């Protein structure tokens, strides 16, 4: 299995090199040259299987021979051993034909744990074998950073620096990044919004002297391994609901498009997905684009679902690459236009996108009302991001086809919004009950590339 860049000018790589590289050297994102297929018999057999077994079946064809079977199984088993639910990703019925996929039973209470815990194990295995050390730099709108720090804290071959927008994430998200005591992890509170953090991250990857000098690696959802790990729970949940004999639809709250793109990959692999619904908050650039209005950046408006407060949706580039017939030159042109503010999608590419994705949006009042109603009618406490999905989903439900909405985070990660909507203060799990008492360790940094590079050089282990 080889991986190619969405911009067509970077060398093809193995899975291991793709994972350790992150962003391609031409600025593009890596995607597999071909999509492996999983037949109906194999999908049917997944019903009732342990999550780890399904994960091995789904991901193994993408990995090739860069990890042995024993190495890969070991990484999977260690990654999910610490999850707080035996099913790892349990389904809960909300309403007739509408299910919630709980993706918040990992160590940091968010769906990012499914990928990040696995990547931590894969990185450590590969780097130990190679005798190498890397510097991971990531940007987060809240959940990616805490998941990355949790996954890599204390590992011998990795230094981790996470950029997050100062004052624009929840207190729980911040404390999950700032309270670990291991010396190899660093939380950097940067001036600006998430798009600024993501832009500086890409600037660092495009500075090849810096990139090579510190052996830069990335674990944002630009990293293909992140997307791949998220493909698994589409298979596990669909099989539990009757796939392959029954089609299943999914509604995905998303800002950076990686989680819903994982669903698209599952569909391309042969999983009978009927509808993939992109659910956005008031920062609705993806909904506007998929509605035929072009992709044009605006001002990021802070919301109660901050992980979706994004204007530059990195993984959308992967969707555009396929929509434009895998034409790297066309994607490069679009990304150049995006630097100037935005672009229009060609008629043919838009038709392809709309063949695969539907979309909807939730206002702040919609989100709050959905949290209130869900508790009253179902007894479920929803985080604001999950509530965005639950609000959007009903318009896309069709009789006879189950709809699964991805519950992306535990409500206790956003206690203020949940309490304002319900009067209930969601409690953290017992293992995190002292989070608010732990001392914090963070560094304020400017939105300045030179200052960021200097800080990383000075504070990484040599």
Language model feature labels by segment:
Residues 1-462:
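PLP-dependent amino-acid enzyme catalytic core
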